Amino acid sequence: MMSESNKQQAVNKLTEIVANFTAMISTRMPDDVVDKLKQLKDAETSSMGKIIYHTMFDNMQKAIDLNRPACQDTGEIMFFVKVGSRFPLLGELQSILKQAVEEATIKAPLRHNAVEIFDEVNTGKNTGSGVPWVTWDIVPDGDDAEIEVYMAGGGCTLPGRSKVLMPSEGYEGVVKFVFENISTLAVNACPPVLVGVGIATSVETAAVLSRKAILRPIGSRHPNPKAAELELRLEEGLNRLGIGPQGLTGNSSVMGVHIESAARHPSTIGVAVSTGCWAHRRGTLLVHADLTFENLSHTRSAL
């Protein structure tokens, strides 16, 4: 058992770690996003597309040089936490994450993006009722905490949709739903976008899964071979739309398509789509029981 003074020191230390990490990912793209954008840039053949990709990389470099957010919309901060039941600060983690967001808002700085519903007042701290949003997965007997930070920008959040299909619509209905949403809405989401598809029973379970899907490293595949094949076929088909970087036409519309799924009710197919923009700001931090940590998503950047 920690003494109260030692626990407070540990709380302060972890708060600082998470705050620094959150501020850092506002200025730097994760390794896989940079690599994918470079791949798309090298493959682009349209003159306008080449100019847009050049501007994107110039923007990313200036963000690093000036230590300023890569996009002025630093989003609403969300955390997806996979934590062991024996992690020493499990009981304090919710408040740690909230305090870390408030500190990162000043350090980065982050744009103020938390508006209280009905009052329509911006809190000015990026925290508020239910914000930061935290999704929990508890691992029995584990003592590490894997903290995924996601900055949900307005533009890339707007195309999000969820629907419950009749089972007779089948996977063809899922594909139709994805294409209808991306073809009509992704143009305003700062493409090329990363597409997350959730398939489950209801709108809420599918929606959470679709968000988790865009947290996976780009190009990772669903463990079910049939789902993995559908990911690839959707990616190929969506790229044929020719939306291109920033919606100005080009070879690629998406950085990738990821599917997350859960067993469904026999009478329903819940499907949801979430998108991440080209400036896909998310990061994965692995914190051990002794509060040493590993930056899993930004191996080329030091905290």
UniProtKB/Swiss-Prot annotation:
EC number: 4.2.1.32
Positions contributing to iron-sulfur cluster binding: C71, C190, C277
Keywords: 4Fe-4S, Iron, Iron-sulfur, Lyase, Metal-binding
GO molecular function: 4 iron, 4 sulfur cluster binding; L(+)-tartrate dehydratase activity; metal ion binding
Class in the EC hierarchy, top level: lyase
Keyword 4Fe-4S: yes
Induction: Induced by tartrate, via TtdR.
Superkingdom in the source lineage: Bacteria
Required cofactor names: iron-sulfur cluster
Catalytic activity: (2R,3R)-tartrate = oxaloacetate + H2O
KW Ubl conjugation (keyword) present: no
UniProt cross-references to Pfam families, sorted A to Z: Fumerase (PF05681)
Assembly: Tetramer of two alpha and two beta subunits.
Similarity remark: Belongs to the class-I fumarase family.
Protein's name according to its UniProt entry: L(+)-tartrate dehydratase subunit alpha
Species whose genome carries this gene: Escherichia coli O157:H7
